[in-house]
Regions:
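Catalytic beta/alpha-barrel core
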Residues: 3, 23-31, 57, 78, ...
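Active-site mouth loops of central-metabolism enzymes
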Residues: 1-10, 60-72, 116-124
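Phosphate/diphosphate ligand-binding glycine-rich loop within oxidoreductases
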Residues: 221-332, 431, 443
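Active-site-adjacent beta->alpha loops and helix N-cap segments on the catalytic face
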Residues: 31-46, 93-107, 124-126, 148-160
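NAD(P)-binding Rossmann-fold cofactor-contacting core
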Residues: 358-379
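Rossmann-like adenosine-cofactor binding region
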Residues: 377-448
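Glycine-rich adenosine-cofactor-binding loop
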Residues: 170, 223-231, 318, 328, ...
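Adenosine-phosphate binding glycine-rich loop
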Residues: 427-493
Length: 493
């Protein structure tokens, strides 16, 4: 999808898009003025790309677009797009309703018409959207509805699978997994912006093609994912999809924004999930939905990895445990060390159990005092009141809270005066250098980034699902490159 405010940028986006796909939507309404629209269409007419399928769209504001004009203005621009070489146009249903029935073919529009039904507040009534009224007037229908629940996404994918010439676009972050699977499920097209995503639930064209490989997914593709809330910050899709690509495995790993576990688990079979990672805030609550889990997960009381067995039953494991030991063990002899764990959630539980089993004396400090006491009792640790941190000393401090996580990167769970230790480890990996780690470094305290734990637990997950060795170097390289690029973007003026 080409969406730019100037003819120059639209032309540049079109060139980039055509290097990746022959089918491109041109959002003429995004161009900031009529003169920019004219300039771009002149460019298009003079530089008609060969073997390209161009779809012209000039959506009015009333239909969710940017064109400040009437239906006749919209049709005029679409007719000019046809003259410039566009074979298809996207026409909003509200515009078609304003025209006399059967009159649309009288206009000099592109040869093929894609009728768009948009609802930015909810999923529209699907059967009503594709009614008999439009038959013979249009060539295909696009349904773009806000997916408020995962069940909404499933409903739209099922509809696309049984309908001819239908384009399914589940909108919003909840709809992203279904959007990535749309082509596999029968949608005629899948949409992605040429540049970075412009709204929740979008991924860029390069991500869709090279990370998720949406065009190559088929009925044999194994589907995995990560569930959490929030989930947009997660680099797990990059980590796992990089491994699938490196090992040439027909599998994909998708991000699921999950607010209600029960709703997700009810819809999960429709995605054909073979396994999924579990992150905040579901690591503990997922336990009651599992049919079985390993002894370690039951003892910890938290799960970060689920295997979906052939009979559909769910089996839980915890690889956070491995990640903590792997990462902190590089800096510190854990046996007989005194380690403070901040937090009492799922990640904190894994850290506390891992460290006590490794022979460390563990202290728990958490905002929720009852949860801190329960974790200390079950893990064989002690409770350390927050007020004691000004005077208490430790060999290591481990932050297992989300404080400092992207996008709230300027805050730290501890003040400099509370850092009395030799090593500080932060389980947050995005950003790589959290505010807590920066404060520790200023005091010449050794630091351990959450990236090390993230990689270790993710590699263990991948090997658990795939039953083969993971391409660790490729996975590490991809994650570090993404984090360093992010850091450069943040520091550039």
């Amino acid at each position: 999808m080409v969406a730019a405010d100037s003819a120059r940028e639209a032309a540049a986006q079109l060139r980039r898009a055509l290097r990746e796909t022959p089918t491109v939507e041109l959002r003429l309404d995004w161009l900031k003025s009529d003169s920019e629209r004219r300039r771009f269409l002149v460019f298009l007419q003079r530089n008609r790309p060969r073997r390209a399928l161009l779809i012209a769209t000039c959506r009015r504001r009333k239909g969710g677009g940017l064109l400040a004009g009437s239906v006749q203005d919209e049709l005029r621009w679409l007719a000019q797009a046809a003259a410039a070489g566009c074979l298809w146009c996207d026409l909003e249903v509200e515009s078609l309703r304003k025209l006399p029935r059967g009159s649309i073919r009288k206009y000099s529009l592109p040869r093929r018409i894609l009728l768009s039904v948009h609802d930015f507040g909810r999923m529209p009534r699907l059967d009503a959207a594709v009614g008999a009224r439009w038959r013979g007037q249009v060539d295909a229908i696009k349904i773009a509805g806000a997916a408020r629940t995962i069940a909404d996404s499933v409903r739209l994918l099922r509809f696309a699978a049984k309908s001819r010439n239908c384009v399914a676009v589940p909108m919003g972050e909840v709809g992203l997994p279904a959007r990535l699977l749309a082509l596999r499920e029968g949608s005629a097209l899948a949409y992605a912006p040429v540049s970075a995503a412009t709204a929740p639930g979008q991924v860029s064209l390069r991500e869709m093609k090279y990370l998720y490989r949406a065009h190559a997914l088929n009925g044999q593709t194994q589907v995995f994912g990560v569930i959490g809330d929030p989930i947009a910050h997660s680099l797990s899709p990059l980590l796992h999809n990089t491994a699938f690509i490196a090992r040439r495995i027909n599998a994909v790993y998708l991000p699921f924004l999950v607010k209600n576990l029960r709703d997700f688990l009810k819809a999960a079979p429709d995605f054909g999930l073979r396994g999924f990672s579990v992150t905040l805030p579901h690591k503990q609550s997922i336990l009651r939905h599992l049919q079985d889990c390993d002894a370690l997960s039951a003892e910890i009381g938290a799960v970060n990895t689920v295997v979906v067995r052939r009979d559909g039953s769910l089996y839980g494991c915890n690889t956070d445990y491995v990640g903590v030991l792997h990462a902190l063990g590089k800096k510190l002899r854990l046996a007989e060390s005194r380690v403070l764990v901040l937090g009492a959630g799922g990640s904190a539980r894994a850290a506390a159990f891992a460290l006590t089993r490794a022979g460390a004396a563990v202290g728990i400090s958490a905002r929720r005092s009852a949860a801190a006491r329960e974790l200390a009792r079950s893990a064989g640790a002690e409770v350390v009141p927050h007020g004691a941190l000004q005077t208490e000393s430790f060999d290591a401090i481990v932050n297992a809270t989300p404080v400092g996580m992207y996008p709230d990167t300027a805050i730290s769970p501890l003040e400099p005066g509370e850092l009395h230790c030799r090593v500080v480890m932060d389980l947050i990996y995005r950003p790589e250098r959290t505010q807590l780690l920066k404060l520790a470094a200023q005091k010449r305290i050794a630091t351990v980034s959450g990236v090390e734990m993230f990689l270790a637990q993710g590699i263990a997950q991948w090997e658990l699902w795939m039953k083969r060795r993971a391409p660790q170097k490729s996975m590490r390289r991809a994650v570090l490159a993404a984090l360093r690029a992010e850091e450069r973007d943040r520091s550039s003026p």
